Amino acid sequence: MKRIYVVGTADTKGEELVYLASCVEAAGGRPVLVDVGTRRPTVLVDISAETVAAVHPGGAAAVLSGNDRGTAIAAMGEAFARFLPARDDVAGVVGMGGGGGTSIITAGMRRLPLGLPKVMVSTLASGDVGPYVDVSDIIMMPSVTDMAGLNRVSRVILKNAAEAITAMANRPAEETASKPAIGLTMFGVTTPCVTAIVERLKADHDCLVFHATGTGGRAMEKLADSGLLSGVLDITTTEVCDLVFGGVLPATEDRFGAIARTDLPYVGSVGALDMVNFWAPETVPERYSGRLLYRHNPNVTLMRTTPEECAAIGRWIGAKLNLCSGPLRFLIPERGVSALDIEGGAFFDPAADAALFEALETTVNRSDRRRIERLPLHINDPQFAEAAVAAYRDIANP
């Protein structure tokens, strides 16, 4: 039977942990108390810290025998990230903690499938929680008061968390979707293209559009790695620009990694590779002084990529595409890669585009399964969307 994992550091938060578990039970859930503390627990638990720590590559001693708190927390986080996904009876996870506990518990939560309920009551939840949530669906709930014993506020917060996780865990199972899901990447400057693709595919596909802001690409690839996507139309690969040239919305070095690992049908393009993103104009690094900038809005500044930068981007993407052995089509719109890169537009630069296209074509090892095709179109032309859809249907239904 599926159970709700109630997770905390029983060495420092034992009283709160037991109370949270009792609230889960009162709400109709089956709680399992899991200790991820690094010292002796103050309460009885169902799964001990030693059990969790034992799955660390260095064994339990690597987690529990040291004297440095920071090292122990990092090691327990690594152990919990291995322990939790291996359990087959998890209906949901609710955690509670301060800085150390939040780091440990969310490390495990991030490894769970999207859709499996996850609630983290944390003293850090009202701040920047990006490092803890990343591209997962963890629900962060502020503890309001510190986790230093039960009081009239903490009791209410923990009870709410217990009722939330129990309600989510006990909801009726949804029917399996009949349409295959596909991931698409979009930016404001490629919206006409992606919208047109969705219109053409939505009748027989569940179209999941991701904003190409760094986290968007990672979220899409996480779904691909999780087996939740049937294919990808990666129209907007702009996150690579920010990775290579220090923008604020970067991909990681693992961009395209899920495509290589899964062999999913993949149609890609060069959407918004004409720009690097920064915040307000004064945040643009000094090394880019004198560059062509475009004020997208008061808080976002775009920098046009040069021919040399475009060539580097093309080589980077091309090398990644060479690692993909699944069916792949990469489409090059010769008349512009974004709404700004069009004749008369702020970023229109045929020389930069040519450098990008030539670097891609030179780098990619082409085969029957891995093809690059030039089209005499702008990326936002309706005919380009039609070509992308045709390419996807060709490789998804060979």
UniProtKB/Swiss-Prot annotation:
Any matching Pfam family: UPF0261
InterPro entries: Tobamovirus_resist_UPF0261, UPF0261, UPF0261_C, UPF0261_N
Record's keyword terms, sorted: Plasmid
Coiled coil: none
CDD domains reported in the protein's UniProt record: Tm-1-like (cd15488)
Protein family: Belongs to the UPF0261 family.
Protein name: UPF0261 protein RA0729
Protein's organism: Rhizobium meliloti (strain 1021)
